[in-house]
Amino acid sequence: MRIKSILLSLSAVVALSAGVANAATNLVTNGNFSDTSQGGNKQLAYTTNNIEANRTTLDGWTSSNRNDRYNFVLDTAIANTDKSVKWMKTSIAGGLGQGNVFASDSQYLPGTLSQNITGLTAGGLYTLTFDFALAQQVGFNGVNNDNFWQVGFGDVNPTQNSALLSIANGGFSGWKTATMTFAATSTSQVLSFLAQGTGPGAPPFLLLDNVSLISAVPEPSTWGMMLGGLGLVGFLARRRRAAKLA
């Protein structure tokens, strides 16, 4: 009976720790690109002022490049149809990529997508995760090799690259998940994504979704809850031992 009680208590601690971990605050605003100024399925504007009807912006994000040309918000539900602002040859919907996704052509005036992240602790480590994929536009042919997202976080940290994605003519890479760790050097830093590729290919569109940045080290409150749970297990064990000796 004593062992069963301790095991139940341990299970409670594990569940508590997992719940706290899952509740870690995502410091990225609009990481799934669902919030836009003028709807999805449009080309991104480089400014929030006087936006044309066929342009949109992503809440929390800035799209920067010459004449705001080849950065887009695509709707995965229609991306492989002629209703899409950029018609992909295959479906890009999947378990990871759903709804709005950010799309950029690495070979034709790609623009940096960036967001200023606040609430950081200088010297703290942060884990960045995001989902990404590679697809090809209708009307073009050719192999697309070695495309990747170049990720920056502040002016001091070196950039990091996602895994290379390559597809055959008309192919789709499927959705992948990238995980990176960065150190904060100040209380606010700019997180940025830039589509890159080593070969011209034929309109390779890199896709991005579900961007998340969380502290890599549990906050003091998290440690307190975990230690409190472990203390409870110890207390129950001592109480049962004392009851048995009495």
Describe the function of each predicted region.
Residues 119-129, 186-188:
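Extended extracellular/luminal ectodomain segments enriched in beta-structured repeat modules
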Residues 189-193:
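Short, well-structured beta-strand segments within conserved domains
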Residues 235-246:
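C-terminal membrane-anchoring or membrane-association module
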Residues 151-155:
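Conserved aromatic beta-strand anchor motif in extracellular beta-sandwich/beta-rich domains
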